[in-house]
């Protein structure tokens, strides 16, 4: 049985997947896990760019979701992405962070998309 934290994470990941699909991306894989790290979402843009997405979901306005993605987390993401890419053909890659803050009162949400976090978010 899933914990409340896992359920909240799944809601956020579904919202983010929908966000990418609406922008014309294809979903490649979800929840790829390795002993040293995980990839929440892997998508591909129409130009062939493979994007590795970290999704952070929070309720309310407490500690910032984006700030919770540390250098250590990005290192684990890169390592997982390198493993996932082995034996695959790809053009360009990018790392994005997408935060979802859900209002516990209304159920509404705010989604912030930070593209290319290794190069400085755009």
Curated annotation (Swiss-Prot):
SUPFAM superfamilies: Restriction endonuclease-like. Gene3D superfamilies: 3.40.1350.10. One of its GO terms (molecular function) is nucleic acid binding. The lineage of its organism: Bacteria, Bacillati, Actinomycetota, Actinomycetes, Mycobacteriales. Belongs to the UPF0102 family. HAMAP family: UPF0102. This is UPF0102 protein CE1920. It comes from Corynebacterium efficiens (strain DSM 44549 / YS-314 / AJ 12310 / JCM 11189 / NBRC 100395).
